[in-house]
């Protein structure tokens, strides 16, 4: 896979510095063992009260093309464009109620942690993973008959890195551009809001 290491202010582990969100996919299938590994990594994410509210719906083109196409159809047109070769889509969802029926205010936070574990494991396996909010949540909910207390949060495309030159010229430029983040001083405060860390 192409490398785009983060330009960090302090040295961090390669697994984090090296993870990025590619858009160039090949159509090569992802193995069942690789899929199980990324899902196992997600399974071991931390969660409030160990509630583990996350649920992942896997759409593997090589296993069930009909279901894959239904999930793909919920992506916004822009995301459909560059995801056309992607072999796997994974919907990230979460139970928003606790086992007692109370609102789980940490459900989305916990599901995000599980999703991050999933994409870090994907990176460790040399796979490309791209998390997206650009999909029709209501269409997904209806198409796949989700229970009322299950919230669709994101879609992750997963696969092997492909040929960047097959991307649209604008996306090709973005794919090759250095990664950027705001400065550490803008996100970390010490002892109070906006106080220097």
What spans do the regions from the language model cover?
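Acidic, surface-exposed loops and disordered segments
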Residues: 1-197
């Amino acid at each position: 896979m192409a490398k785009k290491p983060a330009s960090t202010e302090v040295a961090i582990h390669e697994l984090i510095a090296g993870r990025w969100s590619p858009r160039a996919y090949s159509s090569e299938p992802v193995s069942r063992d690789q899929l199980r590994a990324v899902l196992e990594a997600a399974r071991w994410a931390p969660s409030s009260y160990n509630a583990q509210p996350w649920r992942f719906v896997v759409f593997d083109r090589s296993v069930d093309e009909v279901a894959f196409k239904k999930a793909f159809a919920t992506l916004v047109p822009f995301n459909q464009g560059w995801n056309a070769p992607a072999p796997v889509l994974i919907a990230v969802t979460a139970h928003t109620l606790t086992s007692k029926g109370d609102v789980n205010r940490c459900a989305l936070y916990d599901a995000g942690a599980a999703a991050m574990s999933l994409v870090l494991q994907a990176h460790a396996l040399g796979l490309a993973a791209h998390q997206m909010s650009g999909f029709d949540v209501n269409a997904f909910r209806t198409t796949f008959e989700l229970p009322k207390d299950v919230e669709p949060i994101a879609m992750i495309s997963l696969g092997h890195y492909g040929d960047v030159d097959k991307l649209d010229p604008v996306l090709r430029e973005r794919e090759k551009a250095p990664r950027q983040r705001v400065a550490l001083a803008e996100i970390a405060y010490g002892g109070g809001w906006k106080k220097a860390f």
